[in-house]
């Protein structure tokens, strides 16, 4: 008898799942599903408790949905990726599996694991799929068959390639001929978990699809005008579903073009499309430059920057107590919700690296440990952009002023007051420099003074980067 095994990883959905669809194509095959939890590996990769909670909930939803299709989900737990190789081999042997289907992951450890699995399954046909991207790595290359290192040329080539052939979404599988089955007992991950707002980050696949549809209908067209202002609900909030595979990027693309057909030609919706392409860009980069997975800077000379070791400053940044309101409000949003507005990710990253001169990798790790939408490629790409260490990054002399950033993107201080209750009584725009208002008003605030002087910090950072660059 032909037995197909679908190995789920970061693709926890029925709709538009390339590996699942391929496994179910043969209507006479027996289809099984497998998920392997690797808590120790997750801890090494700084997975956040909120993301673990989301995955746990999605797994239980997936188990029920698969059972309705007649597909049992086998759940196993081992320490790490190395141990998972033996589990796949064991499950295949116990169930006389003839074909293994899985969706590629592009990180170094994951790719090494998959190579070992295929090597161990000599009598099993293994098929992998580029499911987590719209266009696979290698599909968008320069004329010299090299990976693009600058986003805009990559984007232009990506759009050109897309117009040559739009990847379709595949349907959810039909019920197997054997009929529905009873789902197994609920899954509980052996990993720290923390609750989150399911209204913002839906657990059920159908709710994520509905959120995507709602955003593309009502938000994507105004995204360019709304996306930079954290007090406004101007972003999609779909990043967590994309990170865990509750949604596919193809679903996002097709829904966007269905609601905003001019997005491909620079019209309404095109800026959100650019965000999807940035996601592709960082994944393609990570595939071609695996050192990015190992926290190495893309620009080699930046590894010579003499970072400051200052635990007190790092902790103040982490806790949202730097004395700079927009930075602190953003960090408290992150700590309270597991999510941070994208503009604020840029501001807080710039502050850590270029005001405090703390190694960007400290920030990269902390973000991963808190974010419900933690994604190695996107998080690393964002931090290397802010630190001027990455490809197509901000130049090292571009240093955000945390006061003017607050004035520009939270003009009236609405977002700041939402997350810093100790500043609610500071009037108007004075909230961006509350220490000045407090001094004039003769008021003592329960809020710290700035931990660094921005002008002095800027000069110190410029000197550190210029010194590092001398040896280049």
Language-model-detected regions and their locations in the chain:
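Trp/Phe/Arg-rich N-terminal binding region typifying the photolyase-homology
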Residues: 1-166, 463-468, 472
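Active-site-proximal binding-pocket segments
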Residues: 233-422
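Glycine/tryptophan-enriched, flexible segments
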Residues: 145-299, 409-410, 414-472
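A broad detector of short, well-ordered amphipathic alpha-helices
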Residues: 21, 90, 206, 328, ...
């Amino acid at each position: 008898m032909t037995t197909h095994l679908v190995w789920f990883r970061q693709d926890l959905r029925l709709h538009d799942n390339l590996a699942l669809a391929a496994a179910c194509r043969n209507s006479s095959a027996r289809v099984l599903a497998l998920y392997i939890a690797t808590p120790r590996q997750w801890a090494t990769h700084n997975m956040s408790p909120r993301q673990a909670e989301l995955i746990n909930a999605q797994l239980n939803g997936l188990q029920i949905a698969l059972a309705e299709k007649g597909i049992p989900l086998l759940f196993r737990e081992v320490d790490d990726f190395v141990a998972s190789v033996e589990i796949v081999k064991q499950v295949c042997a116990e169930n006389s599996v003839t074909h293994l289907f899985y969706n590629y992951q592009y990180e170094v450890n994951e790719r090494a694991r998959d190579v070992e699995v295929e090597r161990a399954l000599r009598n099993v046909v293994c098929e992998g799929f580029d499911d987590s991207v719209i266009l696979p790595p290698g599909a968008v290359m320069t004329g010299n068959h090299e990976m693009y290192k600058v986003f805009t040329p990559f984007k232009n080539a990506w759009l050109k390639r897309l117009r040559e052939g739009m990847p379709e979404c595949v349907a959810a599988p039909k019920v197997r001929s054997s009929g529905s089955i009873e789902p197994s007992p609920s899954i509980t991950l052996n990993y720290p978990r923390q609750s989150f707002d399911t209204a913002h980050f839906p657990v059920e696949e159908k709710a994520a699809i509905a959120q995507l549809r709602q955003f593309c209908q009502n938000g994507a067209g105004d995204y360019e005008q709304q996306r930079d202002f954290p007090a406004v609900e101007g972003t999609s909030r779909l990043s967590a579903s994309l990170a865990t595979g509750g949604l596919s990027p193809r679903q996002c693309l097709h829904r966007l073009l269905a609601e905003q057909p001019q997005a491909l030609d620079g019209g309404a919706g095109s800026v959100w499309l650019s965000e999807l392409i940035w996601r592709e860009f960082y994944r393609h980069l990570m595939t071609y430059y695996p050192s990015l997975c190992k926290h190495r800077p893309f620009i080699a000379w930046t590894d010579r920057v003499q970072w400051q070791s200052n635990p007190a400053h790092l902790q103040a940044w982490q806790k949202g107590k730097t004395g700079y309101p927009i930075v602190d409000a953003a960090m408290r949003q992150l700590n309270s919700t597991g999510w941070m507005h994208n503009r604020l990710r840029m501001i807080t990253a710039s502050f850590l690296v270029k005001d405090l001169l703390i190694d960007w990798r400290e920030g990269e790790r902390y973000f991963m440990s808190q974010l419900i939408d933690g994604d190695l490629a996107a998080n690393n790409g964002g931090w290397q952009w802010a630190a001027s260490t990455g490809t197509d990054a901000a130049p090292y002399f571009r240093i955000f002023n945390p006061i003017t950033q607050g004035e520009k993107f939270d003009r009236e201080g609405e977002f700041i007051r939402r997350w810093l209750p100790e500043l609610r009584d500071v009037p108007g725009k004075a909230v961006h420099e509350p220490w000045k208002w407090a001094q004039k008003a003769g008021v003592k605030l329960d809020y710290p003074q700035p931990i660094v002087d921005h002008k002095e910090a800027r000069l110190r950072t410029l000197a550190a980067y210029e010194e590092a660059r001398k040896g280049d």
